[in-house]
């Protein structure tokens, strides 16, 4: 039988009332019989709840405790100490119920297991690694979609922002899929600058009737997820590598494309002006008007004839300035006779006008090049206009034609000039015979 160990004195706080009872002789006898002897002296120091949370103080009523656990105490294999629960002492001297089992955790320790920092970031960003992207659907499981929506709702609520889950054609939109698709491409700024919203929207397989895919999904993201993205990026929880360089490259690409298209447009305009100037010089020498050709684009044949008449009148008005002459000349427009030789070509329009020194012929031969139109004249006052397309099976339905214009007076064929300009416009100046 082991000798009694002397109890060590401990400082008891002044505000604590209570007495720790000394074990009885019967309890000492039972302890000495049930547990084996240990070469290390047993530590029977009594402690209070205010000093140490984990204690080895003996239980006041050891007999009842042994009966509850089957008459056996757990023995520590290293030093033979008995694992017993602490006895709580109340401020009024009474004792609370003593329980056996594991000791309470230290104050300040979390009750839940520690979560690694990497998993916390992944939970907040909801992104998939490369390995997960090959195995897991980007749309996410239904429980993941619901958890993501709750996370975004909580964020908006904390920041006093209005949030309403978007719906696409009456069905709730998968915001988790939209979030992963945009962040995977580099974030909102990159997707907007690079004009990738249609690519994002097409991944949702919109119906054919949806003609505003880019605008629709951009608005969805701006209203539901843009502030959430900004928050994560500002706090460093969301890192988008290459997001700073992509917009600049996209802007440079866009600027270069605009510059290239602008330069091409400039070249085309310059070429049109140069050709127009060339025709104007040629036509001024032969008597044709200098009205820009582009203005007549897209008009039907009848307005073209009227415009041609008006153009000629204006030109004559600038040269002579006599209104009486115009009215007299307008009466002479029907003096010339136009006859079809062979199959009639109604799509060829010819208008003849007589001035004080010549006949002016305005003709429309659309679809024919300069090499495909021939003009012949003789002193008797006859002019032949013939067209021969190189490809007879052309898609425009142009067929060979020949028209003869009979003038009421003799003409000078040596000084007759003809010019074919753009869009199949033919102008012929036929001077009177001197």
Curated annotation (Swiss-Prot):
Gene Ontology cellular component list: nucleus
Alphabetical list of InterPro entries matching this protein: A-crystallin/Hsp20_dom, ARI3A/B/C, ARID_dom, ARID_dom_sf, HSP20-like_chaperone
Biased composition (Polar residues): 92-102
Domain of life assignment: Eukaryota
Keyword Nucleus found: yes
Domain sHSP: start-end pairs: 336-434
One GO process term, biological-process aspect: regulation of transcription by RNA polymerase II
SUPFAM superfamilies linked: ARID-like (SSF46774), HSP20-like chaperones (SSF49764)
Compositional bias annotation for Basic and acidic residues: 25-37, 43-54, 78-90
Molecular function in Gene Ontology: DNA binding
Domain ARID, residue spans: 142-233
Cell compartment(s), UniProt: Nucleus
Residues covered by region (Disordered): 1-120, 237-274
Keywords, alphabetical: DNA-binding, Nucleus, Transcription, Transcription regulation
PANTHER family reported for this sequence: AT-RICH INTERACTIVE DOMAIN-CONTAINING PROTEIN 5 (PTHR15348:SF17), AT-RICH INTERACTIVE DOMAIN-CONTAINING PROTEIN ARID DOMAIN- CONTAINING PROTEIN DEAD RINGER PROTEIN B-CELL REGULATOR OF IGH TRANSCRIPTION BRIGHT (PTHR15348)
Family note: Belongs to the small heat shock protein (HSP20) family.
Protein name in the entry: AT-rich interactive domain-containing protein 5
Organism: Arabidopsis thaliana
């Amino acid at each position: 039988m082991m000798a009694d160990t002397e109890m060590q004195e401990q400082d008891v706080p002044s505000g604590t009332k209570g007495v720790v009872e000394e074990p009885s002789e019967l309890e000492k006898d039972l302890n000495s019989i049930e547990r084996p002897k240990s070469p290390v002296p047993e530590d029977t120091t009594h402690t209070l709840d205010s000093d140490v949370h984990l204690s080895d103080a003996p239980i006041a009523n050891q007999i009842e405790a042994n009966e509850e656990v089957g008459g056996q105490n757990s023995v520590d294999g290293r030093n033979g100490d008995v694992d017993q629960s602490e006895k709580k002492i109340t401020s009024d001297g009474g004792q609370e119920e003593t329980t056996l089992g594991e000791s309470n955790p230290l104050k300040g320790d979390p009750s839940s297991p520690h979560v690694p920092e990497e998993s916390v970031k992944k939970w907040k960003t909801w992104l998939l690694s490369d390995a997960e992207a090959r195995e897991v659907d980007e749309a996410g499981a239904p429980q993941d979609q619901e958890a993501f929506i709750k996370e975004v709702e909580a964020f908006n609520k904390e920041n006093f922002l209005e949030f309403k889950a978007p719906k696409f054609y009456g069905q709730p939109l998968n915001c988790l899929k939209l979030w992963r698709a945009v962040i995977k491409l580099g974030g909102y700024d990159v997707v907007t600058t690079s004009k990738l919203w249609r690519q994002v929207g097409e991944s949702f397989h919109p119906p054919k009737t949806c003609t505003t895919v880019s605008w629709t999904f951009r608005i969805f993201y701006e209203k539901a997820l843009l502030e959430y993205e900004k928050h994560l990026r500002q706090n460093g929880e969301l890192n988008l590598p290459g997001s700073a360089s992509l917009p600049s490259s996209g802007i440079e690409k866009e600027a270069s494309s605009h510059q290239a298209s602008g330069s091409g447009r400039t070249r085309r305009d310059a070429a049109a002006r140069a050709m127009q100037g060339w025709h104007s010089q040629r036509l001024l020498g032969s008597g044709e008007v200098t009205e820009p050709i582009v203005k007549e684009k897209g008009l039907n044949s009848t307005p073209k004839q009227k415009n041609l008449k008006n153009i000629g009148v204006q030109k004559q008005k600038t040269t002579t300035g006599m209104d009486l002459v115009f009215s007299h000349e307008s009466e002479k427009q029907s003096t010339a006779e136009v006859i079809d030789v062979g199959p009639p070509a109604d799509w060829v329009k010819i208008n003849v006008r007589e001035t004080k020194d010549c006949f002016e012929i305005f003709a429309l031969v659309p679809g024919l090049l300069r090499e495909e139109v021939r003009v012949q004249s003789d002193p008797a006052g006859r002019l032949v206009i013939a067209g021969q397309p190189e490809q007879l099976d052309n898609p425009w339905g142009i067929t060979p034609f020949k028209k003869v214009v009979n003038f009421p007076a003799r003409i000078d064929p040596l000084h007759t000039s003809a010019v074919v300009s753009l869009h199949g416009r033919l102008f012929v100046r036929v001077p009177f015979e001197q």
